[in-house]
Amino acid sequence: MELQVVGANALAVSETTFGREFNEALIHQVVVAYAAGARQGSRAQKTRAEVSGSGKKPWRQKGTGRARSGDIKSPIWRSGGITFAAKPQDHSQKVNKKMYRGAIKSILSELVRQDRLVVVDKFEIDAPKTKVLVQKLKDLALEDVLIITASLDENLFLAARNLYKVDVRDVQGIDPVSLIAFNKVVVTVDAVKQIEEMLA
């Protein structure tokens, strides 16, 4: 199959990478696993055993007229322990390489079908200026966009940092969440070739 390159001849690409069937279940599983892996998982609360304080019974069991109480660290009390205290945990989920690559291929194929993948010969700017990048994107009628280059262009990266709906990645930095998060994905010809090699 071929992908149309803006202002140039069509680029021949692999059917298995850019012409794959849409697999929603696989993409969902991989995206959930990716998001789970990004969780910090460091929250920690204290149980009644871990809260600092005396273990003495606050008042006698009977005769005061108050509700019976055996411990100031009881979860019922203010400043007491948490009943089912959260502990640090690893939320990451295992995803096989074949599944991960399959999900990326499926996303790329769907981007092609929806005309959301824009292939350009090169994507460069002369200076790390946000207004220069904004003008270049305006010329291509692009706004909410992920730009993928073969290697990270420092000028592009610096110019895009201040733009909320623009992100710049190299081929090694792409992930399923970023691919589906933007309205358009701009890829250079060299990046397309690298992606094919990476997913082969």
UniProtKB/Swiss-Prot annotation:
Keywords: Ribonucleoprotein, Ribosomal protein, RNA-binding, rRNA-binding. Residues 43-71 are annotated as: Disordered. Gene3D superfamilies: 3.40.1370.10. Pfam families: Ribosomal_L4. GO terms for cellular component: ribonucleoprotein complex; ribosome. GO terms for molecular function: rRNA binding; structural constituent of ribosome. One of its GO terms (biological process) is translation. One of the primary rRNA binding proteins, this protein initially binds near the 5'-end of the 23S rRNA. It is important during the early stages of 50S assembly. It makes multiple contacts with different domains of the 23S rRNA in the assembled 50S subunit and ribosome. Belongs to the universal ribosomal protein uL4 family. Part of the 50S ribosomal subunit. This is Large ribosomal subunit protein uL4. It comes from Mannheimia succiniciproducens (strain KCTC 0769BP / MBEL55E). The gene is rplD.
